[in-house]
Amino acid sequence: MTSSNFPKAERLLRRPEFLQFNEGASKLHTQHFLVLLKLKEGTGTRVGFTVSKKVGNAVVRNSIKRRLREFYRQNKSLFILADINIVAKKGADVLDFQQISTELAAAFGRLRKKYA
């Protein structure tokens, strides 16, 4: 059984970690999200979430980030060994958790096929 927590070792936390996606990251666009992927060697997947002010106010942005974190916690097996940044696009604020899960599960299914 996989752990259902989200420890610091699995998070992208600092600005330089997010800036690495500007150089040579693979991109996958969905209707409401952009998934940036940087393959790495070593152990563990690290995930970060970016929601800009274009999406909504602080309450809305934090709500989206909570739902994205919960998606990661529940679906760790979908994620490949890489640094991943999930960027919410404008319009992501109207999605409920089920819609987010469906859209991102399909996206990560495509990524697993491409990089497996």
UniProtKB/Swiss-Prot annotation:
GO terms for molecular function: 3'-tRNA processing endoribonuclease activity; ribonuclease P activity; tRNA binding. SUPFAM superfamilies: Ribosomal protein S5 domain 2-like. It catalyses: Endonucleolytic cleavage of RNA, removing 5'-extranucleotides from tRNA precursor. GO terms for cellular component: ribonuclease P complex. GO terms for biological process: tRNA 5'-leader removal. It is an enzyme of class 3 (hydrolase). Its EC number is 3.1.26.5. It comes from the Bacteria. Keywords: Endonuclease, Hydrolase, Nuclease, RNA-binding, tRNA processing. RNaseP catalyzes the removal of the 5'-leader sequence from pre-tRNA to produce the mature 5'-terminus. It can also cleave other RNA substrates such as 4.5S RNA. The protein component plays an auxiliary but essential role in vivo by binding to the 5'-leader sequence and broadening the substrate specificity of the ribozyme. NCBIfam families: rnpA (TIGR00188). Belongs to the RnpA family. Consists of a catalytic RNA component (M1 or rnpB) and a protein subunit. This is Ribonuclease P protein component. It comes from Geobacter sp. (strain M21).
